Amino acid sequence: MTSSTPTAPTAQAHGRFIRGSVSKVRRVLDQIRGRTYRDALIMLEFMPYRSTGPITKVLRSAVANAEHNLGLDPSSLVISSATADMGPSMKRYRPRAQGRAYQIKKQTCHISIAVAAQTDS
């Protein structure tokens, strides 16, 4: 059985192969999920984490998609979903003592943010 409840139009944006650990990006995304666009931008501006830069870029892209493709007002948008998935790791080697080498994994992640019009409920 399918439900016929109308859903709010959503726009999304993806950032792929972003340098940074998935856990560190999720720590920030958990803070902004469910907030309005304006509140999320203010929070991201004052958070002390390095991952806020790419997240802000993806969020602005999602809002631009909503504005251009769906004609929605940015002040009425809410972050409906924000996820981070693991990307490939770049493997590098660091020289160590006595001819050894340690492997360094430079992690990447994929960021997905969806925004929807705020519903009055």
From Swiss-Prot:
SUPFAM superfamilies hit by this protein: Ribosomal protein L22
Gene Ontology cellular component terms for the protein in this record: cytosolic large ribosomal subunit
Gene Ontology annotations of biological process type: translation
Domain of life per record: Bacteria
Assembly and interaction partners: Part of the 50S ribosomal subunit.
Job description of the protein: This protein binds specifically to 23S rRNA; its binding is stimulated by other ribosomal proteins, e.g. L4, L17, and L20. It is important during the early stages of 50S assembly. It makes multiple contacts with different domains of the 23S rRNA in the assembled 50S subunit and ribosome.
Alphabetized PANTHER family for the sequence: CHLOROPLAST 50S RIBOSOMAL PROTEIN L22-RELATED, LARGE RIBOSOMAL SUBUNIT PROTEIN UL22M
Protein name per the record: Large ribosomal subunit protein uL22
Organism for this UniProt entry: Synechococcus sp. (strain CC9605)
